[in-house]
Design a protein with these regions (language model features):
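Structural preference for solvent-exposed beta-strand-turn elements
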Residues: 1-365
Length: 365
């Protein structure tokens, strides 16, 4: 096998497929990147048996063939090569990588041992503008649980309806729901997908193109540009999140988003990350007092102007959770709804963005 490829295109391809390698597997070939040189380019594949990634990239192929090269070592080498053409040439169980005045001879792995790329039979699919997909993932992913003992909470519930696409995540202390409207949705589907994997997909190079989301019996398939990313769906039943979203409120407050963010950040300087921030809403005065305190450190408070519908109320919420939710809102205004100090508080984005963020209250003395 022999081919030449532009260094920047090679680096981009390796960076993408590196997300699919198994770094701690007892199967050596899973730590490598499978490369097939054919026709006008290369097919690169990686897998850890849970996820699989395929990427096609143009190259000048002089001799077709296949090989598997240790991915981490190859990526480190390519990162440090000059901006020039990179030549690969295999010989028995080695590959020589040459660029400019540099040359590396590496041991390869047997391509025959590399698992075949999944032959997926997609039962239903939907196309979504990639920029909107990434925006949804960014809003909900930070709520995904890191507790592996409850697998469904480490995932994001993706569902479609006649109205469009929805993503939902919860760690049982908070809940994030993001919606976008789509036209022409032919089939409705629902799947729980790894939150980590979704963030990796959303981290791909941004282009003004659509990403296709497809489902098989036990996998989710993302097709974007010249790449295919497959991951096993998380099995289990996602919590019935709809039943914990209050249908009514006693107080609804409209804040300027950035003003509320900066106020919470400032009072949070005297509190630990898990400490509560108190929001004291005064309906008559048309403001909210944001305050926080930590024993042996001190206290802080800030008055924020707002529009209040309903009654005055005070509620305490986890400081970091509040910031996470507010930082996910991109509209100029944000609405806050609650019905009592011991009921959830709900942040909703303003006009033009369909995003809900629910936080469970903190009991304070």
């Amino acid at each position: 096998m022999r081919f030449n490829i532009n260094k920047s295109e090679l680096l981009n391809a390796l960076t993408i497929v590196s997300k699919g390698t198994a770094s701690r597997s007892t199967i050596p070939v899973l730590s490598g990147v499978y490369i097939k040189a054919e026709g006008m380019g290369l097919v690169m594949e990686t897998t850890d048996l849970e996820r699989s990634i395929r990427y096609r990239v143009p190259a000048l192929v002089e001799e077709e063939g296949t090989t598997v090269i240790p991915e981490k070592l190859l990526l480190d080498i390519v990162k440090n090569l000059p901006e020039a053409a990179v030549e690969f040439q295999t010989n028995d169980s080695t590959v020589t990588v040459s660029c400019g005045k540099s040359s590396f001879t590496l041991k390869t792995l047997d391509a025959a041992d590399f698992p075949p790329f999944p032959n997926v039979d997609v039962s239903s699919s939907i196309e979504v503008p990639f920029a909107e997909f990434c925006s949804m993932v960014k809003r909900v992913a930070k709520v995904v649980s890191k507790d592996q003992s409850r697998a469904v909470l480490t995932g994001v519930l993706i569902s479609t309806s006649d109205e469009g696409l929805r993503m939902v995540a919860t760690d049982s202390y908070r809940l994030a729901v993001a919606d976008i409207a789509l036209e022409g949705v032919q089939e409705n589907f629902e799947a729980i997908v790894s939150g980590v994997f979704l963030q990796e997909v959303a981290g791909l190079p941004k282009m003004e193109e659509n990403i296709t989301i497809g489902l098989t019996a036990n996998q989710i398939v993302f097709t974007y540009q010249n790449m295919v990313l497959i991951n096993r769906r998380i099995e289990g039943n996602f919590p019935n999140y709809r039943q914990i979203i209050p249908r009514s409120w006693a107080t609804k407050t409209c804040f300027t988003t950035q003003e509320l963010i900066t106020a919470v950040k400032r009072v949070g300087l005297v509190s630990a990350l898990s400490s509560p921030v108190k929001i004291d809403i005064n309906a008559e005065a048309g403001n909210a007092i944001i305050n926080a305190a930590t024993q042996d450190v001190g206290s802080a408070e800030e008055v924020v102007g707002c529009e209040v519908a309903g009654e005055s109320i005070q509620i305490a919420l986890n400081h970091q959770y509040v910031l996470d939710g507010l930082m996910s809102v991109s509209t100029d205004q944000v609405f806050f709804e609650t019905s009592s100090p011991m009921k959830p508080g709900i942040f909703r984005a303003g006009a033009g963005e369909n995003f809900l963020y629910l936080v469970m209250p903190v009991r304070v003395s």
